[in-house]
C-alpha cells in the first residue's frame, strides 16, 4: 500500500482554472482539455472526456463506455446501461432532462462538454435511482445531422438498427428517430431441480428440463422531438414517442419427471404484444440572473395483450388484456445564492391500471395509485484551493412523500420523510473524504399488490398481496477518493438497512399447493466494501479500469435467518491506436442473496474492435468467446418448504459475434451551451405473470 501511494504521489498534476458556476455543474474557463479530467464532487464526479475519446466514439454509448464510470456497465452492442451492484436504476439525462436510450444513441459526441456522474443522488431525484449520468452538451444553432447505426449478429438472429436525423435552425431543433429490434432464439436451455416438503412429512422431487427453448420478439420505436430554446432565458421541448412490441411466441418443450416416475414431455407457450404512446412536455424559464423555474408533464398509455399456456399436470391457460394510464407532473424552483444554491419542488404521479384476466384466471384488476412528493435542498461549498476546487462541500435536503393505493375494498396511504445529508472534505486538491446518510422509500412492483392468483406450474402459484406496504431504506456510506491525471481510485464502505421490507413468502396449502407471495418482513440488510480504480497506462492510448467488492447480506424473515457473502469483480482494458479502438471486458458475474433467494449472474467476457474511417465506423463484437454453452443465470431457493436449484443456458450467446456499421454526417453546425433540469418516465403495467 505504501508503494502504491508513493507511485500515485509521483504522478504530475496540471492545474486548470475551474470555477463553480452552479449547483450542479463546474465549467472550465477557456481551457482545452486534452486528457480525461476528473473533478471529485460532493455527490460524485465531473468528468471531461478527452479529445481522443470523443473522436473515437460514434454514439453516447461508445463514449460512456470509454469513461469507465464506477459501478456502471455500458453494453454498446446491446444499447443498454445498468448498475453492476444492482442498487437501483441508472438515470440518464442530457443537459438535466431525462433521456432514453434512443437519445443516447443519436447523441452528437462532438457537442459533449462534460459528464456529471452522480453516485449519491439528492432528494430532488426520483425513487429507486442509484446513479445519475448527466451529459452536458453544447446546442447546435445551425446545420443538421443524418445517420444510422446497424448492429446485427452473425451467429444468431439478433439485432438492433436505427436511423435518425436532426435539423437545427436558430432557436429551433427537430429530431426524428426510428429503431427496429429483433430476437429469434431457438437455442435456450433450462434445468430445474425442486424438492417440496409435503404435509405428511415426505419429500416430493421434481425435475424440469428444457432443451430447445424458442423465443421471438420484435420491437419498433418512433420518436419525434421538437426543441425551442434561448439558452439564456428559456427552453421548451415536446417529445412524442411510440413503442410497439410483438412477441409472436415463446415455446418450450419441457421434460418433466417426478419422484420414482419416468420423464415425459409437457409444453409451455406464451405470446403477447404491447403498444405504448407517450407525450412529454417540458419548460424551463430563467428568472433573472440567479433563479429558474422548470416544469415537466408526461402522459403515457400502455395497452398490453397476452396469452399463456402451461401443460404441467392439468392444462392451465389464461389471457390478459391490460390498459394503463399514467400522468407524471413535476415542478422545480432553483435559486443560486452566493453561499449556497437552494432548490425546492414537487412531483405528482397518478396511475390507473385496468388488467382483465380471462380463462383459468378470472380477475378484473383495477388499481389506482397516487404519489405526491415535495422536497427542499441546499447545496454549497466552503473554502477553496488555489486552483479553484472547493475544500468543503455539502448537500442537505429533506423530502416528504405520500403513496396511496386503492383496489376494490383494499386501500392504504403511506407517509415517509426523506432526509439526506452528504459532506465532502478535500484534504488536498487530489484527496477527498465523503460521508453520507439517507432515509428513502422502496415501493414494491404494483403487480405484487394485485388481488390476482396465477399458476406457475403444477405445484406452485404466484399470489398478489393487496396489504403489501412500502418500506423505508436507511443508508450510510463513506468514500475515500484520490485523483491524479493518470489515476483515479475510490474506496467505498456502505451499509444499507431495509426494515419491514418486501420479501418472498412461501406457504403450503392443505392439498400441497405451494404459494409464492411477498409480505413485509423484518429486514434485508447489505454491507459492502468496494474499490474502483482507473489507470491510464499509456495516456490517450491504453487505459485499465478495475472494480472489486466484498458484499455481506443479512436476511431476517418471519421464519428464517440467512447470511451470505459474495465477491464481485470486473475489469476493462481499452486501447487506441491510429484509427483502431480495442476493448476487452471481463467480470465474475453478480452474486447476491435476498430473503431466501440466492442469485448468481454468470461470468461475462466480451471484446470489441472498431475502425473509424471518414463518416463511417465499423465494429466487431465478440461475447463469450470459446464458450459453446454459456450459462445465462442460476438461482437457488433455500426455503424450509421448498428448495430449488435453477440453471439457464443460452447456446446462441456462446461465441456470439456481432458486427456494427455506423454512419453519421454533421453539416454546418455551430454550438452554444444549454441547461435543463427535470426527468420523468413511465413503463409499469401492473400485470402479474
Listing of model-derived features with the role each one plays in the protein:
Residues 17-53, 77-78:
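Short, acidic, small-residue-rich periplasmic hinge/interaction motif at the N-terminus
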Residues 20, 30, 60-65, 79-82, ...:
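N-terminal periplasmic accessory domains that precede
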Residues 73-120:
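Periplasmic plug
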Residues 126-133, 141-190, 217-220:
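Outer-membrane beta-barrel translocator/receptor signature
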Residues 150-154, 169, 180-184, 240-246, ...:
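Transmembrane beta-strands of outer-membrane beta-barrel pores
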Residues 219-247, 268-410, 414-416, 426, ...:
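Face-selective signature of the C-terminal outer-membrane beta-barrel domain
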Residues 412, 429-431, 441-492, 497, ...:
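Outer-membrane beta-barrel signature, preferentially recognizing the C-terminal barrel domain
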Residues 613-689:
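C-terminal beta-signal and adjacent terminal beta-strands/loops
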Amino acid at each position: 500500500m505504501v508503494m502504491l501511494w508513493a507511485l500515485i504521489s509521483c504522478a504530475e498534476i496540471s492545474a486548470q482554472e475551474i470555477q463553480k458556476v452552479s449547483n450542479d455543474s463546474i465549467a472550465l474557463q477557456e481551457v482545452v482539455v486534452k486528457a480525461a479530467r476528473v473533478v471529485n464532487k460532493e455527490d460524485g464526479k465531473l468528468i471531461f472526456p478527452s479529445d481522443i475519446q470523443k473522436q473515437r466514439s460514434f454514439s453516447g454509448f461508445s463514449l460512456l463506455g470509454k469513461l469507465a464510470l464506477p459501478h456502471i456497465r455500458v453494453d454498446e452492442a446491446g444499447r443498454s446501461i445498468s448498475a453492476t451492484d444492482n442498487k437501483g436504476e441508472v438515470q440518464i439525462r442530457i443537459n438535466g432532462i431525462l433521456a432514453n436510450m434512443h437519445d443516447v444513441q443519436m447523441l452528437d459526441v462532438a457537442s459533449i462538454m462534460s459528464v456529471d456522474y452522480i453516485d449519491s443522488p439528492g432528494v430532488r431525484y426520483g425513487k429507486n435511482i442509484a446513479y445519475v449520468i448527466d451529459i452536458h452538451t453544447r446546442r447546435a444553432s445551425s446545420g443538421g445531422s443524418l445517420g444510422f447505426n446497424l448492429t446485427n449478429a452473425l451467429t444468431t438472429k439478433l439485432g438492433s438498427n436505427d436511423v435518425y436525423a436532426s435539423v437545427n435552425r436558430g432557436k429551433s431543433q427537430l429530431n426524428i428517430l426510428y429503431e427496429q429490434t429483433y430476437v429469434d432464439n431457438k437455442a435456450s436451455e433450462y434445468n430445474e431441480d425442486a424438492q417440496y416438503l409435503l404435509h405428511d412429512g415426505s419429500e416430493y422431487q421434481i425435475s424440469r428440463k428444457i432443451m430447445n427453448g424458442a423465443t421471438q420478439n420484435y420491437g419498433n420505436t418512433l420518436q419525434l422531438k421538437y426543441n425551442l430554446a434561448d439558452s439564456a432565458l428559456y427552453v421548451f421541448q415536446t417529445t412524442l414517442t411510440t413503442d410497439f412490441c410483438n412477441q409472436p411466441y415463446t415455446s418450450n418443450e419441457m421434460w418433466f419427471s417426478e419422484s420414482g416416475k419416468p420423464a415425459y414431455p409437457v409444453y409451455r407457450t406464451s405470446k403477447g404484444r404491447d403498444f405504448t404512446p407517450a407525450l412529454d412536455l417540458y419548460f424551463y424559464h430563467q428568472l433573472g440572473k440567479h433563479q429558474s423555474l422548470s416544469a415537466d408533464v408526461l402522459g403515457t398509455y400502455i395497452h398490453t395483450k397476452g396469452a399463456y399456456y402451461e401443460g404441467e399436470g392439468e392444462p392451465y391457460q389464461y389471457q390478459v388484456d391490460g390498459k394503463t394510464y399514467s400522468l407524471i407532473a413535476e415542478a422545480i424552483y432553483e435559486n443560486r445564492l452566493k453561499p449556497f444554491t437552494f432548490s425546492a419542488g414537487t412531483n405528482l404521479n397518478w396511475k390507473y391500471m385496468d388488467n382483465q384476466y380471462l380463462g383459468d384466471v378470472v380477475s378484473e384488476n383495477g388499481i389506482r395509485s397516487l404519489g405526491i412528493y415535495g422536497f427542499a435542498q441546499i447545496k454549497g461549498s466552503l473554502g477553496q484551493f488555489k486552483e479553484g476546487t472547493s475544500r468543503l462541500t455539502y448537500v442537505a435536503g429533506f423530502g416528504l412523500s405520500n403513496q396511496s393505493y386503492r383496489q376494490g375494498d383494499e386501500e392504504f396511504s403511506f407517509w415517509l420523510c426523506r432526509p439526506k445529508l452528504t459532506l465532502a472534505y478535500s484534504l488536498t486538491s487530489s484527496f477527498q473524504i465523503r460521508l453520507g446518510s439517507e432515509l428513502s422509500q422502496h415501493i414494491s412492483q404494483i403487480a405484487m399488490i394485485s388481488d390476482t392468483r396465477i399458476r406457475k406450474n403444477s405445484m406452485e402459484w404466484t399470489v398478489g398481496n393487496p396489504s403489501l406496504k412500502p418500506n423505508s431504506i436507511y443508508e450510510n456510506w463513506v468514500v475515500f477518493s484520490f485523483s491524479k491525471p493518470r489515476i483515479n481510485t475510490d474506496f467505498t464502505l456502505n451499509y444499507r438497512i431495509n426494515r419491514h421490507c418486501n420479501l418472498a413468502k412461501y406457504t403450503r396449502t392443505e392439498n400441497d399447493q405451494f404459494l409464492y407471495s411477498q409480505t413485509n418482513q423484518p429486514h434485508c440488510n447489505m454491507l459492502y466494501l468496494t474499490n474502483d480504480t482507473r489507470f491510464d497506462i499509456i495516456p490517450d492510448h491504453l487505459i485499465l479500469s478495475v472494480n472489486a467488492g466484498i458484499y455481506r447480506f443479512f436476511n431476517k424473515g418471519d421464519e428464517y435467518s440467512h447470511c451470505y457473502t459474495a465477491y464481485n469483480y470486473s475489469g476493462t482494458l481499452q486501447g487506441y491506436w491510429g484509427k483502431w479502438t480495442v476493448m476487452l471486458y471481463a467480470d465474475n458475474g453478480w452474486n447476491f442473496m435476498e430473503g431466501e433467494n440466492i442469485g448468481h449472474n454468470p461470468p461475462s467476457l466480451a471484446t470489441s474492435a472498431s475502425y473509424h474511417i471518414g463518416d463511417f465506423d465499423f465494429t466487431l463484437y465478440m461475447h463469450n468467446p470459446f464458450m459453446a454453452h454459456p450459462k445465462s443465470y442460476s438461482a437457488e431457493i433455500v426455503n424450509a418448504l421448498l428448495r430449488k436449484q435453477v440453471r439457464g443456458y443460452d447456446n446462441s450467446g456462446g461465441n456470439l459475434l456481432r458486427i456494427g456499421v455506423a454512419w453519421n454526417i454533421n453539416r454546418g453546425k455551430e454550438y452554444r451551451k444549454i441547461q435543463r433540469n427535470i426527468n420523468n418516465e413511465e413503463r409499469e403495467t401492473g400485470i402479474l405473470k
